[in-house]
Amino acid sequence: MMNFKFIIHPNKMFLLPIRLALIKRSCALGLWCCASLVHAQNMTGIRLTQAQIQDIEIFGHDDNSIGSSESASKGVISSEMLVSRALLRPAELLEYIPGMVVTQHSGDGKANQYFLRGINLDHGTDFATSLNGMPINMPTHAHGQGYSDLNFLIPELVQQVEYKKGPYYAQSGDFSSAGSAHIAYRTRLKEPFAELSVGLHGYQRAVAANSTTLGEDLHLITALERMNNNGPWSNPEGLRKTNALLALSQGSKNNGWSNFFSAYQAHWNSTDQIPSRLLTEGQYQGQAFGLFDAVDPSDGAQTNRYSLSGEWQNLNKTHIDKINWYSIYSDLRIFSNFTYFTDPVKRPYGDQFEQFERRNTLGGALSRSWLSDDRGTYAYINTLGLQLRQDFIRLGLNNTAQRKVMQNVRDDQVKQLQIGLFAENEVYWLEWLKTIAGLRLDQFDFQVNSFLLSQNSGVARSMKMSPKLSLILGPWHKTEFFFNHGQGFHSNDARGVTAKFDPVTQQAVSPVPGLTSSMGQELGLKTQAFKNLQSSLAIWRLNFASELFYNGETGTTQAGRPSERKGLEMAHHWTPSDQLQIDAALAWTRARYANNDPAGHFIPNAVDKVANLSLAVRNTRSWSGSLGVRYIGAAALIENNAVRSAPSVTTNLRIAKKINPQTDITLDLLNVLNRHNNDIAYFYNSRLNGEALSGVEDLHLHPSELRTFRLGTKIKF
């Protein structure tokens, strides 16, 4: 019997009779046919009681079936999928999202490099992430706008990941133009566990978690993680990471509350991207130089993150109420050197710089959804919500040498307030026709106090109204069609919004807008027309009024030219048997600047093709495993497309053996084919000691790790 899971979204719970009626026509499974009797009863005036509503929960695999989405590119990844693959880094959980790529261009303690829909998202510029309702992206961040550090995630505790693509959702605000991922932790465990893993290059990881019931329906989870890793680098990474979690909850997801406390600390050495000319020459300053060597071995960072967050939800016959809140403290000191010695007159000590920040964030959201009494045609949900966020930030930039401060460049205190108000109307006009209309209003207040250049101090306010519209048709023959249109935005760094002078050259500059608009459309379908196969297809378009791009010479994101992207995505989930699961995804993108410029129309680092293939074997007596293959296509590195990155293929393998009901052994083989890939490549000017003062335009790359393994043992108590 297939272990099938269908989780009903709480916002759609009152429309369960309609969902089941539609599914009844498209699926012959006995469970769904029985559930359709509930539809018949409701249509004749018999209503579900509150207790019955709370108890409806169908366990299974995922929530991508017909009737569960507002677009073809939306889905939910279940915990069963999340534990099946080998992961090099925690953030690679996001690679379950079709078309998403997660890499790293420096030390493994910093936020990853993300790519989706032909956008180099840098560390999160246009992809919003959240954990248990708490946003992870950081605006006006010292290292990059929208910085999204997921290294504090404990993958074993993740219950599900809900993902959306495009600016079509009224609940999604800043940084969500390309998409968003909403990660949910478990609030209870089936059984406590302890896991120990070891691998090459000094890799060691230990994680333990316990679940306790305190009184009636009160649940406590405690978890602790410790990880050490040196990586393949000649200058050992020395990553030391400590992670702790407390979770207290009561009730169910639909009627209950949960509170989370998280603490995370990490420090590491970084091997930043290196110039390809050094690899050709094979030596630097009389010493041999190879792929995993560092030009400046003093690069590195340390970070801390502490958070308190909570969620509460109440569902009854007439409405759904939701409240979430969060308080976050974080800090970061990161030392980088991407250009080495470009100005030996002004900076004889080299180009290393420090980006630092300390941040306190307070925020929350509340919403109410009104449910119609009519359970048939013209049934509706009306939702009104409010989101608030206040950031208090001290951040800056210093020129450094060997991590010693040589010159202060920027030192600012920023207060940034975000207020978002959204409204949404969802209506079933006919049994096969549904519309979702939304409107979002955002206001950002920026207040900057510049300690080193007072002229750059100031206040500013930006507002943006973003309409949304979705049309859902079907299902017919187990196939559903979608049309989505929406406007979105990303915020820009507050320091750029109030800037009047360049802090280095003292020349006058023009401030950037506080909010930059985006607009997207999508046409797609989802189908289950073939037995045991779920498929989706999306054709999409996304325009930005200003492209955020990564500047390799400064290590920052900057506002640039307007852009236009269009593409196609396909995803398939096939379970030919109870033991075998196959997932395949393909994404193609055409990305161009939208205005005329002699430099060219190509957008640097806009990956044109991404493909993933995964095979998982499970539900056998004692063995299980998975094989994952990821393809990343080439990308233009400069605007005229004269220099391109190389495509890459990475293959990961996981083999697991159940020794007894309490003990599992897992072997992960990462990059099993030992391919020489690059995690990232840039093309820009840099200068090594002894080179001409003008420097050299060159390809700079950060290699992927070669074949490595990790052996783990998990004991359940």
Where do the language-model regions lie?
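Transmembrane beta-barrel wall of Gram-negative outer-membrane proteins
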Residues: 198-228, 233-273, 299-320, 370, ...
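C-terminal beta-signal and adjacent terminal beta-strands/loops
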Residues: 489, 540, 634, 657-717
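Short acidic/polar hinge/loop motifs at secondary-structure boundaries
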Residues: 135-165, 184
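Gram-negative outer-membrane beta-barrel transporters
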Residues: 367-371, 443, 536-545, 559-639, ...
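Face-selective signature of the C-terminal outer-membrane beta-barrel domain
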Residues: 251-264, 301-451, 529, 533-539, ...
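Short strand-turn segments of transmembrane beta-barrel domains in outer membranes
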Residues: 165-170, 179-212, 229-234, 522
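Membrane-embedded beta-barrel scaffold of Gram-negative outer-membrane proteins
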Residues: 311-313, 320-338, 474, 480-486, ...
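Extracytoplasmic beta-strand/coil segments of soluble accessory domains associated
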Residues: 59, 66, 74, 91, ...
